[in-house]
A protein has these predicted regions:
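C-terminal motif of bacterial Sec signal peptides marking the signal peptidase cleavage site
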Residues: 22-25
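Sec-dependent N-terminal signal peptides
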Residues: 11-19
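Flexible glycine-/small-residue-rich
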Residues: 46-48, 137-141, 152-154, 246-250, ...
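Bacterial N-terminal signal peptides that target proteins for export
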Residues: 2-12
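Gram-negative/organellar outer-membrane beta-barrel architecture
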Residues: 157-162, 298-299, 318-559, 641-642, ...
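Short glycine-rich, acidic/polar surface loops and turns
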Residues: 394, 729-737
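C-terminal outer-membrane beta-barrel translocator/porin domains of Gram-negative envelope proteins
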Residues: 373-384, 498-691, 696-723, 762-765, ...
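Interaction-mediating elements
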Residues: 27-331, 448
């Protein structure tokens, strides 16, 4: 088997390296007009002292302003080979139009003193007249906002705008941009519509811009004052500014400046695709808290439907209540479509009727899926392991007519050793879960939670049982029961806060060791603290913050989790009769930063975690390590890819790599630090079906014991900040990825650039790095 793997790995390495090397590739013109110059390339060069990121952003915007006759269409038929399909005939008029378009954009971005020049050249190659067009852009100094005022000719609107002025997007000294002015007017429209002004729209606002002092043209002004203002205006030539005043476009449109109220709220919760709300008399009608519910199939409880509506009869119209109602229903995962319509009454009462139409999805569905895994050695097997599994799932999307989600899953699978002892592992598991679309807590707690500000709120109840039989080593039975709450707050579309709290998480593991495992535990005593029968009764607290940039180009994702087991429950003696209750505290944090470009992306990740066990075994000996299913590990397709799964570490201790009985043993630690950098880019499309992608990556990190208790076997395995550089491992490699839209397959190839096991030799840098001695990883979807 190993002789077969070598040529496969060599092939993958050569393939990935070759594809990466030819990314620039060649361009082959197709279907161009003969004997006429055609547009082969168009380049934009921006000059000036602009920051690199700002210059790149401006260049992208300018490229979008090019005339269509200067834009080329490149189609990748295979990595490195791109066809220039039907390139347009070069026309100087297109270049002149592009200059006008780009100047308009620069003015919109505050560059009123910009200059644009262009030139072209024609290269003859194989009877092709290839025209290259080059634009040189000198933006000059950009204008900045000076004074920003509201002059709304309606006292109520003016007062409301001034009361929320702190939220204005226009700030004095900020670079001028039409986009920012537009965003500020959108903010005002949203503010007004959230305060009853149902008919108010963007067309009702106008932004007046002024780059000169209006006082200079005032004939009644004192001459000395005019002279002072003139000198001030001249000084501003060096630092140009813009005054902005936002006002009503048509103050006479009085109907747009009236507050509207909601008369009726009519909800149709179970419409069929061919049903029409106009047939309402045929439906059963129920009124709950003034809300009219028209049901034909009686699929939902009226009280439940009414509780999800933030639109209430007699209340002031607020756009956010309409949006919140829409979110409340769509987040249930029970409806395939939800629409909300406001119907204005044809009288002078300034009222609307809210009509909510919902189309439920199929109540139950059954799924059957298969999965496969590949692993090169683990704690008790040294061969190549291949696993196959079969999954059966039954989902109910509307339990008890309250959109409660239930899911039942049965999985069974085997893991075979391709080298010997064919069937290595047999595993089966059964899980059942409920997801309630609300927080099920006592009223005295619920009163202190502002549920109206939450975008989603869920209560999660999970049950899971599993049986694993590892040939010659052990049989393992496990049971898990948990209760959890999850809530997401997202007042702004680009920012979300998600909290997760599990007050009760029970995990029981019953281990029946066999002779081979006992021999292994004798060789590696530390594993005895991890591999035994045990009980976890813990509470888990988690928080996740996601922020996306205004243009979607940047994204931050931060997650932190805390778990504690055995603190309070350890006081109940019956739960710890045989000292099987695990006591520990564990915390971990994960931060990811994404920078997306047009055809590539940069991703940075930092991860860190620590677990502190504080229990004692039945002999009174203090536990040294976390249970294996709560420990940290590194290596594999999702962590430190230059190492096999759970084969990195521990620290710089050579014990696990040199001791005969410890080789290939899984490494579990109490502390983990890891950092990753990945540059992702597109290669092209294969047969117009599969999107081929690639990546260059670097992984940095390791795992450690919190303490070794002075055991000489594990010198270098404990964490010490003073030897962090010595202990850190560094791996780097490349990847070939096939993106099928719904999932992505990764073929990663990585090298150990710094192996802490050999820290005595140049800190382990480039120890035995050879072309074919890399590590292959097969992964599904992105590593992070």
């Amino acid at each position: 088997m190993h002789s077969l793997c070598k040529p496969v790995k060599l092939y993958l390495f050569v393939l990935i390296t070759s594809l990466t090397a030819i990314i620039p590739g060649c361009i082959v013109p197709k279907k161009y007009q003969q004997n006429k110059p055609f547009v082969y390339s168009t380049n934009i060069n921006i000059q000036g002292n602009l920051p690199v990121s700002e210059k790149a952003d401006l260049k992208l915007k300018l490229e979008n302003q090019l005339d269509d006759s200067l834009k080329t269409v490149l189609k990748t038929v295979f990595p490195g080979i791109r066809f220039l399909v039907k390139p347009p005939v070069f026309d100087t008029a297109a270049a002149l139009r592009s200059v006008i378009f780009m100047n308009n954009l620069l003015h919109a971005q505050g560059y009123y003193k910009s200059t644009i020049t262009w030139d072209s050249s024609i290269t003859i190659k194989e009877k092709q007249q290839r025209a290259s067009v080059n634009f040189t852009v000198v933006p000059g100094k950009s204008y900045k906002f000076d004074s920003v005022n509201y002059r709304l000719q309606d006292s109520a609107l003016q007062m409301l705008a001034l009361s929320r002025r702190n939220g204005s997007l226009l700030k004095k000294g900020q670079p001028y941009s039409v986009d920012i002015i537009s965003a500020e007017m959108d903010r005002l429209v949203e503010l007004f519509r959230n305060n009853g002004y149902y008919k108010f729209s963007r067309d009702d606002l106008n932004a007046e811009r002024d780059t000169v002092f209006s006082a200079l043209i005032n004939p009644s002004l004192d001459p000395f004052e005019q002279l002072r203002l003139l000198q001030q205006a001249r000084s501003r030539q060096q630092n140009p500014v813009m005054n902005v005043t936002i006002q009503l476009r048509n103050p006479d449109a009085v109907s747009h400046f009236r507050k509207y109220y909601i008369r009726n709220v009519n909800i149709y919760p179970d419409l069929g695709l061919l049903d029409d709300s106009a047939s309402a008399p045929k439906y059963d009608s129920v009124t709950v808290n003034g809300i009219h519910i028209f049901s034909r199939y009686n699929k939902f409880k009226p009280e439940f439907i009414a509780s999800k509506s933030s639109l209430q009869p007699g209340s002031l119209f607020r756009l956010r209540n309409s949006a919140r109602t829409y979110t409340n229903f769509t987040q249930l995962n029970t409806f395939i479509q939800v629409t909300i319509e406001m119907i204005e009454l044809q009288d002078s009462s300034a009222r609307v009727d809210a009509v909510i139409k919902m189309y439920p999805s199929v109540k139950q569905d059954l799924s059957v899926t298969a999965d496969a895994s590949y692993n090169t050695g683990d704690i008790i097997a040294t061969g190549d392991l291949f696993g196959v599994g079969l999954n059966f799932g039954l989902n109910n999307h509307n339990v008890a007519k309250q959109a409660i989600q239930s899911s039942t899953n049965l999985r069974t699978g085997v893991e075979v050793n391709l080298g010997s002892n064919f069937i290595q592992t047999f595993q089966t598991s059964l899980s059942h879960s409920y997801t309630f679309p609300r927080l099920i807590v006592p009223d005295f707690i619920l009163r202190h939670i502002k549920t109206d500000s939450l975008r989603t709120q869920r209560t999660l109840l999970n049950f899971n049982g599993a049986y694993t039989d590892r040939k010659d080593f052990y049989s393992l039975k496990s049971l898990n029961v948990s209760l959890a709450y999850q809530a997401t707050k997202s007042r702004r579309l680009r920012k979300s806060h998600t909290w997760y709290f599990s007050p009760l998480n029970v995990e029981y593991v019953l281990l029946n060791p066999r002779d081979q495992l006992k021999l292994l535990l004798d060789s590696v005593p530390n594993l005895q603290f991890s591999f035994n029968t045990g009980l976890v009764i813990s509470s888990i607290l988690g928080y996740n913050y996601i922020q996306t940039g205004t243009d979607g180009a940047k994204k931050n994702d931060f997650r932190i989790g805390l778990e504690e087991s055995g603190g309070l429950t350890g006081m109940i003696k019956t739960l710890d009769r045989d000292a099987n209750l695990y006591r520990f505290v564990k915390i971990d944090a994960d931060f990811k930063h994404y920078i997306n470009y047009k055809k590539s992306a940069l991703v940075f990740r930092l991860y860190g975690g620590i677990g502190v066990p504080y229990g004692r075994d039945k002999d009174g000996v203090r536990e040294q390590q976390l249970p294996f299913f709560k420990s940290f590990y590194a290596g594999g397709p999702y962590s430190m890819r230059a190492w096999q799964v759970r084969q990195l570490g521990i620290g710089s201790s050579p014990y696990f790599d040199t001791a005969v009985n410890a080789r290939n043993v899984d490494r579990f630690g109490d502390i983990q630090l890891e950092g990753n950098i990945e540059y992702r880019f597109n290669l092209g499309t294969l047969f117009n079906v599969v999107k081929l992608k690639s990546a260059l990556f670097t992984d940095i990190g390791n795992i450690w014991y919190r303490t070794t208790q002075g055991n000489p076997k594990y010198i270098g395995a404990d964490f010490n900040i003073n030897k962090l550089y010595t202990d850190i491992a560094v791996g780097a490699g490349t990847s070939l990825r096939a993106d099928f839209d719904y999932f992505l397959i990764r073929f990663d190839w990585a090298y150990k650039l710094k192996d802490p096991v050999y820290s005595n030799d140049n800190y382990g840098w480039f120890h035995d790095v050879q072309l074919l001695k890399g590590q292959f990883q097969l992964g599904i979807n992105y590593p992070f």
